[in-house]
Amino acid sequence: MRMEDIAKIAQVSKSAVSLAFSGKPGIGNETRERILRIAREMGYNAKPRVTATVQEKSSKQLVFLVITNLGIISEEYYQQPFFRELIHFVEERCRSKGYSVVFSSVDMEHFDQSIRAVADDHRNSGVILLGTNLSREQIAFVADKLPQLVVLDTCYDTLPIHFVEINNAMGAYQAGAHLCDIGHKDIGYVASNVRIHNFEERKAGFAAALREKGLEVAPSRTFSVAPTLLSSQDSMRQQLEGCLHAEGKLPTALFCECDYIAISAMKTLTELGYRVPEDISVIGFDNINESVIVTPELTTIHVEKEKMARLAVDLLTDPAEHGSNARSKTRVDTRFVARLSTCAPTAAVGVGSSVSKPG
């Protein structure tokens, strides 16, 4: 079975099949899903690479490698604002250095086999691995096959590999300190129901900020939702209603582990009749472009995505400047961004409030 055969069965071009296997933009989701389904049914294992012939022949190229269908990284990862922006800055930095970028996506279902295939094709190329959703063992396996590796958006201190990550603890600490400084004491925490390294560090950083003020997030004020939906979520609605029923009131502020969760939470609160921030303040993390489109504009933590991308590319394109054998762990500091979704607390929102209640 060849790519040409799959293209014929799916009634699409060979280039469309290549885009479907790679995770690159350029075809619709329905077409992509049909191609991938046909490939699975026919037992075809694609070499996980996307490139034009000119790029493959270039001696100045980097590989951007993503493991999909694992944790928060789906086949459509490039449609998620945070990753879309990060990839844009990687491409931009590569162009400025005279390098091309080969995008390669590997389905977790065929992880071992596909990583070996990538290594066969790109053993001498520098590789930026999106590590957001990966375990220590998975990253170690990739590094063993692809020695010129930089891992972006996670960090494992005991691995002798270049890592560039967000200072997650710092960002969440900034969020917690802000809520405490403007007077909030009854604070809730909205976590992702898919756990990754970044979220665990944010949880610790936020708890540290509250602990300094003698506060903590009560278990009844901790919620868990899907991290990749911008719409309101029934599960969030049910958890808020359960909290209100059990406690008689909701927290006066919510910290959300990412902007996606924060925007979803704001929409859910609005549907329930609560005002943001007058009744409940909401703060996110990432400062994606959508954070200034929502109403009210989202208070959040800015992640220096451009700087992270620049550092990752430079570690591969300028190895002499960083020491050819030395490995580094770089945490890029965050910046607090005050907008309109947080304010000082007013009366507790619950039974007896002027705001209409769910139920």
Task: List where the protein language model places each region.
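Hinge/beta->alpha junction and helix N-cap segments in small-molecule ligand-binding domains
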Residues: G71-F82, F103-H110, V164-Q174, V190-Q238, ...
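Short hydrophobic segments within beta-strands
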Residues: L65-I67, L130, L152, Y189-V190, ...
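Short acidic/polar active-site loop segments enriched in Thr and Asp
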Residues: S13, N45, K60, S125, ...
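Alpha-helical recognition/docking segments in bacterial nutrient-uptake
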Residues: S59-A177, D181, L244-K249, G359
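N-terminal helix-turn-helix DNA-binding module of bacterial transcription factors
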Residues: M1-S58, S354-G359
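Short acidic capping loops at alpha-helix termini that bridge into adjacent secondary structure
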Residues: K185-D186, V217-R221, V276-V282
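Flexible loop/turn connectors
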Residues: Q233, R237-G359
